[in-house]
C-alpha cells in the first residue's frame, strides 16, 4: 500500500514538473515572440495618426472588390475598422500599378475605373500627403485636418402579427420598429499633426423603440428610452507604429460579410481601450521574409444591466499576410470580471490563457477563439471560369478553449465565396455565404453552447445582442447578394437570406428574407440610397430577459414584415 502511495506521489510530481516545464516553455516562446513584435512595431517606421473609417462606409466594399479583382495586390482588409490613411495607401497601390502598366486591359476596368476614380476623390488629401497625386494648395493637408459626414435616414417599417420590433442585423443594437421614423447622425473628425485624432458621432432616433438597451417584451422594456445617444466618441494617439485609442466604437474581426463569429457591429458599440499596430509591419532580421503582420487588441466594458455589472472583454487579434493572395487571422476573446467577481486585468487574462478550461473562483472566465482566412484564386480554364477569378474565405471558431485539433469540440464555422466580376467587361458580382453555430448541437447534443456561459449567464452579449454573428446560438444562416452598376454612379443590389435561430429548442424561428436596394452617387461626396426588405418569420422571437439571457418564440405565429428605408449621406 505504501509502495502504491509512493508511486502515485511520484507520478503526480512528474506530471506537475511536466506542466511546469510546459508553462515555462510557453512563457519563453511568448516572451521571444513579444520581443520581436515590440521591436518590429518600434522600428517599422512612423505611422501618421489618422481617424478610422466608420464600418458602414462604402470605401470598405470598394477596396475589397479591387483587392478581389487583383487591382490592389498587397492589402490587409479583413480586420476593420482601419484608418483613412491606411485606406489611401491601398488606393495608392492601385494607382501606382496602373501607372506602371501592371494592370492588363482585360475587362476588369469596367468596374475598376469608376471605383478607383471615386476612391481618389474620397481620399484625395491623404493621397496628396503620401505624394501619390499633386495638390492645388487648397486641400486640408496641414497639421490640422478635419472633416464631417452627415447621414439622415427615413424609415417606414410594418412589423406584423403584433411583433412591434424586429432586431436589425449589424446596426449597432438597433431594431426595426413599427411606424415612420427618422435617424440622423453627424460624424465629425479632427487630426492633429501626426500623433492625435478625434472622432465624435452623436445620433438621433425619433422612435425610442428603435434602439434597445434591454428586453423587447416584459417589464424591463422600460430600459428602451433613448432618443439621442453618442454612437462613437474616441481619441487616438500614435507613436511610431503603435496606436492607443480610448472611447466608444465598433469593430469587425473576420472575413464574413453578413456576419462574423466573434466580433461584429451587431451589438451596441463598446466602451473600450484599444492598442495595436497602426499599419502592417515586417518582423526584424531573418523573419522579414515571412510576410506582413498586424496586431489589434482591446479591453472593453459591457453594460450595467447584466449578470455581473460592467463585465470586461479582452480581445486579441493577429493578422498575417504571407502572400499577396492570402490573409490569415487568429482571434481570441476573454470575458471576465464585473461587480463582485474580484478579478483584475491583466492577471486574470494571463491566467485564462495559460490554465486549462473550466477553472473556478477567481480564475474562471468565458472564452472564444477563431482562425480565419481570405484567399484570392485566379481564373483557371474549366475550373474557375470567372474573368477575375474569385475569392474564398472562412472562419472556424471555438466556444471555450480549442481543446482538440483540427476541429474543436465546441465548433462553429462560416464559409463564403465572392466573385468580383461574373462576366467579362460587366459590373455584376456575386457573394454566397453560409454560417453555422448549430454544428456542436448536431454533433454532441448539447444546446445553447455558442454565446452562452454557465457563469456569465448574460453571455457574450451587449444588451442581449451577440458580439458576434446576429443569428446567435444553435443557428444557421444562408446569405446571397449580387450587385450591378447600371451606370458608373448607380448601383442596384439584391440579396436573399434564410436563417434558423435557436434550433435546439422545441420551437425555433425560421426567417425567409429578400431585399433590394439602389444607391446613387450624386457626387463623390454625396450619395442617396433607398431599399425595401420583405421578411417572413415563423415563430418569431423576442428577448424577454438578460439575466439569464432568455428569448421567447411565438409558437405557431407567422409574421410578415415590410421594411422601407431611404437615406442621404454627405461628406464635407
Question: Each predicted region: which residue ranges?
Answer:
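Asparagine/serine/threonine-enriched low-complexity, disordered tracts
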Residues: 2-23
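Bacterial N-terminal signal peptides
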Residues: 32-42
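N-terminal periplasmic/intermembrane-space "pro-region" immediately following the signal or transit peptide
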Residues: 47-176
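Short loop/turn motifs that connect adjacent beta-strands in outer-membrane beta-barrel proteins
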Residues: 76-78, 100-114, 129, 133-146, ...
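Extracellular loop and loop/strand-boundary signature of outer-membrane beta-barrel proteins
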Residues: 170-174, 216-221, 258-263, 302-304, ...
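Surface-exposed loop and membrane-interface regions of Gram-negative outer-membrane beta-barrel proteins
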Residues: 178-180, 198-237, 254-259, 263-264, ...
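Signature for the C-terminal beta-barrel architecture of outer-membrane proteins
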Residues: 252, 272-457, 473-480, 485, ...
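Outer-membrane beta-barrel "beta-signal"
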Residues: 318, 371, 520, 558-572
